């Protein structure tokens, strides 16, 4: 696959041209030679019709979306944009949202003056995770007649919501389904059909490429899928420009461009090997440790049955040179995407060798 942003910045870095433009580093410091601004030929993220538009089209084909737009402001920018696109007519400010959402959704609702009808997941060991059913979504739609339904899948502990049934309910009522898939960009390469929301009825969704793919922090995608969403597509870039920086990082955009080439040529084999290694580690640990049923790229342990709090276990693993993604009183989460099979196996063995505290159970 061609990499137009990478190719342009490579050629510019080699050109020897005097950079009488921003940024102030002028490409003379480490990591800065490819960091440019909207010079001639470099396109512009929010008015893309050149190399950025071409790169976005490449990524859209990989994700089988109607349209994919780049964000250098993470999924936060995509979430603000999705909600604004749904609420832009001003007639309906209501959003039905699953309560275990990221704070960027809350911030967007405050900024956009949205009215939220909360959908509460069924409690399952944690306040940040829980099962959500199509029936619960339908009750919320019938109660509030929202402009859209918003859910997070995978959630922070790695649990995936069955989106198909929820999408059917939303579309039966003529309501848009928005999915915060920030932790699940790599799901485009797992399963048949892939587990990514694009394949299961999401009208729009966001991916934080930097969370699970080889992209720089802040690199994200906004996917537009449903024909009903197409009428908003022309406004998407304009809305993104309202919330995003007018100086989006070319290093981030270059990394998204190179990521497209990685996904096109190597991602299928890479993530299949990761899943096989992760499955082996989960099988190794499951006889002793309480392993949650999660997405392939997360190893989530429910720690109380093993005599630890999640934060205690995180401190112990740090001594083994393993830094986890998240820990609280009851859970610990390790992200496996981006690791080699050997690194995943090392993590598993490190956990399996930990001593089990004795737990006194009164009779």
Label every PLM stretch briefly:
Residues 283-363:
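Conserved C-terminal alpha-helix-loop-beta "cap" of PLP-dependent enzymes
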Residues 42, 69-71, 149-152, 333-337:
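Short glycine-rich or small-residue beta-strand-to-loop segments that form or flank ligand, phosphate
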Residues 1-50:
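N-terminal "arm"/small-domain region of PLP-dependent enzymes with the aminotransferase-like
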């Amino acid at each position: 696959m061609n990499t137009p942003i990478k190719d342009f910045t490579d050629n510019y870095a080699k050109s020897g041209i005097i950079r009488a433009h921003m940024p102030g580093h002028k490409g003379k410091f480490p990591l800065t030679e490819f960091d440019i601004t909207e010079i001639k030929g470099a396109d512009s993220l929010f008015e893309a019709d050149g190399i950025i538009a071409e790169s976005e089209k490449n990524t859209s084909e990989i994700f089988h979306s109607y349209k994919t737009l780049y964000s250098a402001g993470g999924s936060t920018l995509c979430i603000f944009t999705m909600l604004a696109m749904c609420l832009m007519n001003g007639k309906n400010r209501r959003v039905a949202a699953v309560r275990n959402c990221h704070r960027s959704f809350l911030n967007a609702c405050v900024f956009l003056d949205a009215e939220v009808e909360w959908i509460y997941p069924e409690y399952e060991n944690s306040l940040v995770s829980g099962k959500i059913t199509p029936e619960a979504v339908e009750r919320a739609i019938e109660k509030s007649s929202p402009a859209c339904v918003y859910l997070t899948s995978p959630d922070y502990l790695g649990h995936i919501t069955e989106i198909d049934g929820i999408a059917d309910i939303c579309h039966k009522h003529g309501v848009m389904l928005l999915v915060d898939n920030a932790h699940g960009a790599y799901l485009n390469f797992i399963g048949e059909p892939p587990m990514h929301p694009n394949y299961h009825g999401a009208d729009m969704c966001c991916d934080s490429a930097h969370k699970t793919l080889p992209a720089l922090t802040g690199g994200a995608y906004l996917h537009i899928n449903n024909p009903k969403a197409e009428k908003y597509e022309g406004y998407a870039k304009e809305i993104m420009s309202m919330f995003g920086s007018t100086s989006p990082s070319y290093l981030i955009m270059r990394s998204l461009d190179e990521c497209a080439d990685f996904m096109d040529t190597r991602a299928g084999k890479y993530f299949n090997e990761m899943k096989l290694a992760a499955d082996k580690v989960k099988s190794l640990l499951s006889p002793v440790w309480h392993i949650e049923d999660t997405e392939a790229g997360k190893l989530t342990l429910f720690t109380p049955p093993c005599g630890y709090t999640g934060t205690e276990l995180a401190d112990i693993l740090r001594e083994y040179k393993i830094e986890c993604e998240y820990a609280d009183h009851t859970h610990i989460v390790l992200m496996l995407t981006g690791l080699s099979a050997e690194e995943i196996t090392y993590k598993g063995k490190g956990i399996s060798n930990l001593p089990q505290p004795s737990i006194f159970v009164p009779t």
